[in-house]
Amino acid sequence: MSKLDRWRGQIPDAELATYAKGMFAHPVGLGRYPALLNIDTTYMFVDPAYPQCGGPTDDFQAALVAITDVFRKLDLPIYYSRRDDRAQPVRRGLWNEKLAIPATGAFIDSYAHDPRADEWPPSYGPRPQDCVILKNKPSCFFGTPLESFLRYQGVDSLVVVGVATSGCIRAAVVDAFSHNFRVVVPEEAVSDRSAAAHWANLFDIDMKYADVKPMREVIKMLGKFSVG
């Protein structure tokens, strides 16, 4: 099945034809040494107790556990990103205005000083050997040493998981593509507050920047990498 065929029924045929004409949708696959990039799956964004959470389900978290276990068994690098919880306004930049209470202008972050908000569930969270990237903007490449770390380790491709598909996932995928990393996105292991935004962005990512595949296919792709 071609990339275009898998979207039939969700995307009108006339629109798919324009992508075919433009020669989009070619697969990129994985390179010689992939890493897992887990974006923003801290309690703040996966636990309904936090107002910033929206979209993640038990199936989503099970998918995170599954792909993390595969990378650990293969001894492949795992990277995590989360917000920089240091609360200086200058670090937040325009988030101060975009996420503000209109009447007062106060920044909306009732969990700024809640350490648990920035921790991960232990079932898929980081271990001492993993690298955690702190970020202030949607892309974990922007203003961080992530690219330098990946190059040092010889990483040439990424499996990207996390939240939210239309925001930080998309931003990271586009930046990874811009840095010439091959990217694969397991569709069950990304989530969004909006189903419409989720699927629209997965389609666009699949057409232009990466490969969006079911988890079973991603795990099969990783089968060529052996321990050691």
Task: Show where each model-derived region lies.
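Acidic-leg catalytic submotif of subtilisin-like serine proteases
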Residues: 35-45
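Active-site loop/turn elements of alpha/beta-hydrolase fold enzymes
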Residues: 41, 83, 188
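Active-site-adjacent betaalpha module
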Residues: 1-35, 69-74, 99-228
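Short, flexible, mixed-charge acidic loops at enzyme active sites
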Residues: 91-99
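A short alpha/beta connector and helix-capping loop motif
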Residues: 32, 49-82
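Short, well-ordered beta-to-alpha junction loops that form the rim of enzyme active sites
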Residues: 81-84, 163
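Acidic/histidine-rich helix-loop elements
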Residues: 7-13, 46-57
